[in-house]
Amino acid sequence: MKRLALALKQKKVASWKLEEVKELTELIKNSNTILIGSLEGFPADKLHEIRKKLRGKAIIKVTKNTLFKIAAKNAGINTEKLEQYLTGPNVFIFTKDNPFLTNMFFENYKLRRYAMPGDKAEEEVIIPAGDTGMPAGPILSVFGKLKVQTKVQDGKVHVVKDTVVAKPGDVIPTEALPILQKLGIMPVYVKLKIKVAYHEGLVIPAENLKLNLEGYRSNIAEAYRNAFTLAVEIAYPVPDVLKFTISKVFKNAIALASEIGYLTPESAQAVISKAVAKAYALATAISGKVDLGVQLPAAQQTQTQQSTAEEKKEEKKEEEKKGPSEEEIGSGLASLFG
């Protein structure tokens, strides 16, 4: 037994494993980010498409989990938190890029494969019209089961019109599988499932790698609108805000001049219009009690009444409208503008 144990100890490690560990160690040392993806259920032949797409941005390696673990330790990484992810067939992605952006690539990059029994359609599966290249024979009955109209021309089966054989969510009919393969139709999407990312000492599980860009855009846009509204309200002195602030101040000044009857070239029209409206309103109110010696046009009376009503509405709005308190403005400035 002692001799057997000694022989096992002296057994040499395969040279390819040593080379693999050496290469992996260098890759780990030269990468800011390492992603571990599961190859379970993922067609191995599709990896070359991903390699092609990420050429110059990332290096993709399929290796044994034990070899990666040894290399990681050699590179000074504590693999304790990665242990749970080093199971089953894995692929390792080495990159200098941000882990979130790299994961986004894998989230959005879908590959196609041929359908297998039990697969569900993610989109309409269509057998297109035209020459199938298939010789007439038993295959015609299969087309019949799928309710695909066909005709035989020059000994070949031709599909008369585009036909949907599966809708989104439907299981793709087993009868359709050989036809889809012969026609080169790959209706099933597959994507590499990322398990975890290791970035500069941080272990980031897959669920924490997903970015909700639309949500972020919406939040930023809302924050900008709120900040801009506040900035206009307090006349914060920056170019983008001042042009709106000046416009608002000008309108308020004209409204005030109109109310107190202050005449300037800019306010004259508003002041006179308001004075005329008030005069007609007063004349209308007393015309039934006092003979004014003039006939008020009916249309003008209606217009005056409408103007008076609108003025009351505007006054009510102004009364209801309350600006932010000094404390609110102070806290808003502190949070928005440092």
Swiss-Prot record:
Q: Name one Pfam family in it.
A: RL10P_insert
Task: Return the annotated region ranges for Disordered.
Answer: 298-338
Organism superkingdom? Archaea
Bias class Low complexity marks the residues at: 298-308
Stretches with biased composition (Basic and acidic residues): 309-325
Note the InterPro entries from the entry: Ribosomal_protein_uL10, Ribosomal_uL10, Ribosomal_uL10-like_insert, Ribosomal_uL10-like_insert_sf, Ribosomal_uL10-like_sf, Ribosomal_uL10_arc
Membrane-spanning intervals of the chain: none
Record bears the keyword Ribosomal protein: yes
Q: Which GO terms describe its biological process?
A: cytoplasmic translation; ribosomal large subunit assembly
Q: Which PANTHER family match?
A: 60S ACIDIC RIBOSOMAL PROTEIN P0 (PTHR45699), LARGE RIBOSOMAL SUBUNIT PROTEIN UL10 (PTHR45699:SF3)
Its quaternary organisation is: Part of the 50S ribosomal subunit. Forms part of the ribosomal stalk which helps the ribosome interact with GTP-bound translation factors. Forms a heptameric L10(L12)2(L12)2(L12)2 complex, where L10 forms an elongated spine to which the L12 dimers bind in a sequential fashion.
Any idea what this protein is called? Answer: Large ribosomal subunit protein uL10
> Can you name the source organism?
Saccharolobus islandicus (strain M.16.27)
